[in-house]
Amino acid sequence: MFHSRALLLSWLVGFTAAKDIHLDWNITWVWAAPDGFGRPMIGINNEWPCPIVNADLGDRLIVDVHNGLGNQSTGIHWHGFHQYMTGTMDGSNQVTQCALPPGSSMRYEFDVNQTGTYWYHSHEMGQYPDGLRGPFIVRDPSPPFAYDDEFTLTLTDHYHEQMSVLLQQYEADSVGAQAGVNEPLPAAALINEGFDTTTLRVEPNKTYLIHLVCVGNWPGHVIVFDDHEISVVEVDGTWVDAYPARDKKIRLATGQRMSILLKTKDNTDRNYAIWDSMDVNMMFFYQNRAIPEGFNPNTTAWLVYDEAKELPPAPDVHELDPNNDFVDDLVFVPASHEPLLEKVDRQIIFDTGVTQRDGRSVYTINGQTYVDPEEPTLYTALAASPENASNASLYGQVNPFVVQYGEVVEIIINNHHGNLHPWHMHGHQFQVLQRTIPEGGYFDGYFANISSTPVKRDTIMVQNHGHAVLRFRANNPGVWLIHCHIEWHVTKGLTGTLIEAPAQMHKISVPLDHQRICPSYGTPPGGTPSSPPHDAPRPDGASGSPQYPPKPWGEPDASAPEQDDSQPGGTPDSPEDFPQPWGEPEESPQEPPQPWSPSNNAQPPANTYAPEYPSGYVPVAPGPVIIDSELHYGGKSSHVECSGVNAGHTQDTTTGGDGCANAS
């Protein structure tokens, strides 16, 4: 376990034989205090933070998951992994699987066929901000850049109340609201799930690969490595030509990842701070919202050259200009130099905004808000004939968009809202052709400065009252979400669904253990969102559904795992009722005792941090915790051109004349 510490591993560069990585995970409630305030968190195997998953290209990942929460269903999404022809392993509840009920188990199994920086998290409402999240790093046997060692840093916003409470508050505030409501404020920013406790041990004249993973719920993060040269070399699993950041700062939206090369100094004269700040523009300025007295959006980590020397304060960073102070990810060039996808076959426009529906504020795509289907959308597609599966009306209120195999698809997202939205696509990376600055206006058919080799990623921040243009090739049959990655907005329907390559999708089969968890909800796999299962014609002409056992629906399955009825019926109320993951600190020169006690039993000081949070905030004592371990966080293991207005469109897929617009 790594309570808010950076952990560094060395790994031997060279050939590594492919292997099976078998993990047994029990999803449980754990009492933890990442910023000194004790609260229930969702952990794995009675520990929190959740473990990092390290793998090598070519491995096979096998994760057996048991839901030991007792009072919530769950599931695991592998964020950024395309799951080519293994769409049932995407882990999106009511999209590619039924939610995993308390006391039940299921397996995720897929080939590790992508390299780079990813993460895993629950796709059940509100669970990953409650702690069910962790990095997933896949090492490349032949990286395009040389480096000596590597670290992983996660960035997140943290809350003192559980999400179930905050979501109820957020929903209550939306009743009668005309233009959306203010999201609940976080209590702290965390680096590696700790507040002002993370240190990276470094040596002079070395180059380190640092994976940055924004696992947050709402605001983006800005990170600064004081007085060090850094170059961006990877975004969202794509190696890019090295891009020196120079005086620009790194900003990551929720769900985004980035890897940098950091060159260390040639001496050990001093240590250096790493400054991380939650995006105050998103939380306050774009919402015309006052900053509460005492609110602290920042946290600090350190590059430690000499443990005997002091840890300096964070660098003095004043106001940030969103138009000029950050590295623009559109300048990155994929190391593969993959060319711009041209001749667009299908253009999809998302006009996104907020409106009133049934007396409450909701988000919409083209006037429609996403509503969870009664059964997973993938199962609906698999149970239909290939012809019927192309009928968008089959899928209910999931904002479905059907695309056919091999099509070049262009998605235009017009953000009619006054704040930023990070959009994530499952099953793909997309090329980013264009993204405006804040208040940059909506897409009018014109492009400006389109790269001939656009950056590829799976999560993009779309600016307030602006737009973004994305392209991908539909070569991954399945059902894939495309959604805002702010959990508050997902609860209010800011989600779409891609029904991709319906004719080829029927080659996908649903594992038996995935089928067995559906009867727990009385949800048959197959049929339409509101009908019982039915036999559907298969491409080979055979009748019936080979994905599902040929027995009456609801009949007990003797091979199904027994339900565990001993689970608690709710979240424990005190630390004594939880598994205690911290224990006594081990005697080790590398791991001094924790500088704080994860408990709220002591009399807390007056809580002036934010009035809406309960009392019990225990200040964290200054000073880092440093640990070396074979577990968790660490382990080594452009040319821009204007392509013109059409930029690959056939004449009937876009409007406008000649020339380039000024959006950037």
Swiss-Prot record:
Localization terms from the record: Secreted; Cell surface
E.C. numbers: 1.-.-.-
GO biological process: cellular response to iron ion starvation; melanin biosynthetic process; pigment biosynthetic process; reductive iron assimilation
SS bond partners: none
Principal location listed in the UniProt entry: secreted
Residue ranges constituting the Plastocyanin-like domain according to the UniProt record: 19-155, 156-339, 340-521
Residues that, per the record, bind Cu cation 3: 123, 426, 483
GO cellular component, one term: cell surface
Annotated pathway: Pigment biosynthesis; melanin biosynthesis
Gene3D superfamilies: Cupredoxins - blue copper proteins
Glycosylation sites noted in the Swiss-Prot or TrEMBL record: 26, 71, 113, 205, 298, 388, 391, 449
Residues that hold Cu cation 2 according to the record: 79, 121, 485
Matches recorded under CDD domains: CuRO_2_Fet3p_like, CuRO_3_Fet3p
Region (Disordered): 516-623, 635-664
Alphabetical keyword list: Copper, Glycoprotein, Metal-binding, Oxidoreductase, Secreted, Signal
Record protein name field: Multicopper oxidase abr1
Native organism: Aspergillus fumigatus (strain ATCC MYA-4609 / CBS 101355 / FGSC A1100 / Af293) (Neosartorya fumigata)
